[in-house]
């Protein structure tokens, strides 16, 4: 049996933020958030399921009324931030990496140009190459908020995909690519697709996958 992963992004859902979360998701092994969710929501999931939670921030960050709590709102207690990191989860024998945010379209937080995204992605490359030597593979799961260029993205500036993400997928062939940001209300738009050997998942709301 594979690793059962609960993926989250963008909107709070009653199925997750519920007193019945343990009965609904009690067989989950790991939680991954792709951004734009408040810290209290992620902390609730961590405390109720007692599981490790990896995350990246989205481009919408809820600001606290008091600056004393600012750090907590961007970095939920007990969660592991994947932004610009390559992480080996020893318990699940899983290699993860992540990049936060979206393409820059206004002066909001966690927005970057294509060039800035390239620099961050290329910064992951040495450790991904090292993974190949140590573990026999580059990467299992790539986690972002925005989508990759030409893969479940859109034409407007805010939702254009990231060129560097597409390059990473083509170069390092992770088994799974998880992203948020794309609010798909149209059932005809796919939330699950394939790019080469990589399964691409839009995690809008929540999805349960097995890795």
Placement of each model-derived feature along the sequence:
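Short, well-ordered coil/turn elements that cap or connect secondary structure elements
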Residues: 26, 48-50, 74-77, 82, ...
